[in-house]
C-alpha cells in the first residue's frame, strides 16, 4: 500500500481571496449622534443589548418610518439591563456578586443572539466594559492596583467571538472629555470604553450631529473597497451603504 504523504502545513488554514461580507465596527459619538439609528439599518434580525436605556424615542420612530415604507416592522429586538450603580449601591453587601450575575446573564444572552441574529449591537460597549470591571474588581477605582489581564481577556474573547461567524457586530461607544492636565480640558473628546476596541474591530466609525443632520466619519476600515471610504465623512450613512462600499461584489439585497 503506498504511503500517504501528509503536508505538515495542513495543520494551518489556507487563506482565501474571498472576504466575509459583514461589518464588525465601533460606533463612537456623543448623545444623539445617530449611533443606534445607524445600526438599526443593519441586516435583520437585529438584537440590541442595551445598558443605557436609550432606545425610547429612537427605535419607535425608526419602526414607524420602516413600516410606512415596507408595510411591516423590522425585526429589531432589545434586552435592557438595569445597570446604573450609585455610590449607595456600591456600599451594599453582595454588590459585586450582583455585578457578576448580571455580567454572566449578559454573556449568555450575547452568545444566544450571535447564534440566531444577523446583527448584534452592544449599546453601549462603554457600559459593558464598566460592568465587566465591576464584576471583576468591585467598586470603581478598585482596579487601580489590580491585574487587568482577566477582565481584558474576557472582553477580547467576546468581542472576537462574532469573527468566527458571519454576523454583523456593532460596539457603540460614548465619548469623554480629553484632559491635558489634572484641572484643564483640551476641548477635544476621546472614546470611552475598553481601550483595545479600535484594534479589535474591522471598522472604526465616528458619529456626529450638526444642524439637525447626521454625519459619519469612517476611520480604519477593512475590505476590498476600504480605500474608497477611509478618512471620509458621509451624511445619513447606513450599514448597507458601508457594506456595499467595503464589499463591492455585494448589493443591497445582501444587507437587508
Role assignments for model-derived ranges:
Residues 54-55, 127-129, 177-178:
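Short acidic, S/G/P-rich loop/turn micro-motifs used as interaction or catalytic elements
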Residues 88-165:
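Phosphate-binding/switch loop-helix module in NTP-utilizing enzymes
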Residues 44, 65, 136-141, 187:
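Glycine-rich, phosphate-binding/catalytic loops in enzymes
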Residues 161-241:
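Phosphate-binding/switch region of NTP-binding enzymes
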Residues 7-9, 19-115:
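Conserved P-loop
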Residues 48, 123, 201:
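Residue-level signature of catalytic and energy-coupling elements of molecular machines
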Residues 52, 123-124, 171-176:
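A short beta-strand-to-loop transition that corresponds to the Sensor-1 phosphate-sensing loop
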Residues 1-10, 19-23, 212-256:
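C-terminal regions of RecA-like/P-loop NTPase motor modules
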Amino acid at each position: 500500500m503506498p504511503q500517504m504523504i501528509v503536508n505538515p502545513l495542513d495543520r494551518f488554514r489556507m487563506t482565501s481571496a474571498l472576504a466575509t461580507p459583514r461589518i464588525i465596527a465601533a460606533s463612537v459619538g456623543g448623545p444623539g449622534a445617530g449611533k443606534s439609528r445607524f445600526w438599526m439599518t443593519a441586516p435583520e434580525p437585529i438584537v440590541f443589548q442595551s445598558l443605557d436605556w436609550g432606545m425610547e424615542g429612537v427605535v419607535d420612530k425608526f419602526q414607524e418610518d420602516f413600516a410606512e415604507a415596507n408595510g411591516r416592522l423590522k425585526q429589531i429586538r432589545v434586552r435592557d439591563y438595569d445597570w446604573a450603580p450609585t455610590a449607595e449601591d456600591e456600599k451594599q453587601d453582595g454588590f459585586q456578586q450582583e455585578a457578576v450575575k448580571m455580567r454572566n446573564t449578559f454573556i449568555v444572552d450575547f452568545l444566544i443572539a450571535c447564534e440566531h441574529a444577523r446583527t448584534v449591537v452592544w449599546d453601549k460597549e462603554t457600559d459593558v466594559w464598566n460592568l465587566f470591571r465591576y464584576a471583576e474588581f468591585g467598586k470603581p477605582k478598585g482596579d487601580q492596583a489590580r491585574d487587568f489581564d482577566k477582565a481584558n481577556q474576557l472582553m477580547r474573547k467576546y468581542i472576537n467571538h462574532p469573527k468566527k461567524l458571519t454576523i454583523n457586530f456593532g460596539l457603540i461607544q460614548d465619548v469623554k472629555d480629553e484632559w491635558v492636565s489634572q484641572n484643564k480640558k483640551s476641548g477635544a473628546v476621546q472614546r470611552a470604553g475598553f481601550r483595545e476596541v479600535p484594534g479589535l474591530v474591522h471598522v472604526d466609525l465616528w458619529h456626529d450631529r450638526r444642524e439637525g443632520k447626521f454625519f459619519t466619519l469612517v476611520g480604519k476600515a477593512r475590505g476590498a473597497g476600504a480605500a474608497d471610504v477611509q478618512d471620509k465623512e458621509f451624511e445619513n450613512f447606513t450599514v448597507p451603504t458601508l457594506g456595499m462600499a467595503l464589499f463591492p461584489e455585494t448589493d443591497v439585497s445582501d444587507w437587508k
